[in-house]
Amino acid sequence: MSNFSIKIADLPVGISCTHPHLSDVCSEYLTDEAPLFSVGADEEHKEELRKFFLGSSQVFSDDFLESVAVQEKVCAAVLDYDAAVFHAALISFDGQGIAFAAPSGTGKTTHIKLWQRLYGDRVEIINGDKPLFTLRSGRFFASGMPWCGKENWGCNKTVPLKAICFIDRAEHNLISPLEDNREIMSRLFLQLVMPEEHRLMVKYLDFANKLINTVPFYLLRCNMELSAAQTAHDGIFGIE
């Protein structure tokens, strides 16, 4: 058994694990600070995950299942600290965070790569799959997490959250602000990393409601051409 601490955003977290894979995943986030809470993966949790993945064509190792189990426990525990994890691809553009959200296969990964091609070093991928959002003194911030999707795109940084942009595939590029909170919530609900415990579920939905009423939301209908990134940029930041 190995024990170590990591720091995600401003939250120090204690980790217990039996496989070196997890410490490798978390290596960029190690800290000496005393943890606010600690998590580990028990055998029952790993067995539940093993059954969940049973229909997959892949065979998942025990160290992978341990990493997923710990990730799920972290996602639940942070809700007690005005923080929540969402399914999204988070980039930093000139130091400001933009989160792109869409169902799997829509093209989030392709879209953030277009931003990199168009804007170069002005763009940094903070987390390609599950960033952490935090609410601090009335402002939302977005941070990297050790777990960042199959591409493993991410870094240990925190940026102010400028906007959240939903992506729909379309032939032509068009971005528009979303102002109907019911539509925003219906789209955002698909991106929630929902905990099982009712108490934490209530906290998650309250956090999401505050997010909707604080951060600008957009709907980007786009293709996979470079001009899609230009359209998104101009809609969020204005034409340079």
Describe each region flagged by the PLM.
Residues 111:
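Hydrophobic positions on the alpha1 helix immediately C-terminal to the Walker A/P-loop
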Residues 1-104, 114-124, 132-240:
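A noncatalytic interaction/capping subdomain that flanks phosphate/NTP-handling catalytic cores
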Residues 108:
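Conserved lysine of the Walker
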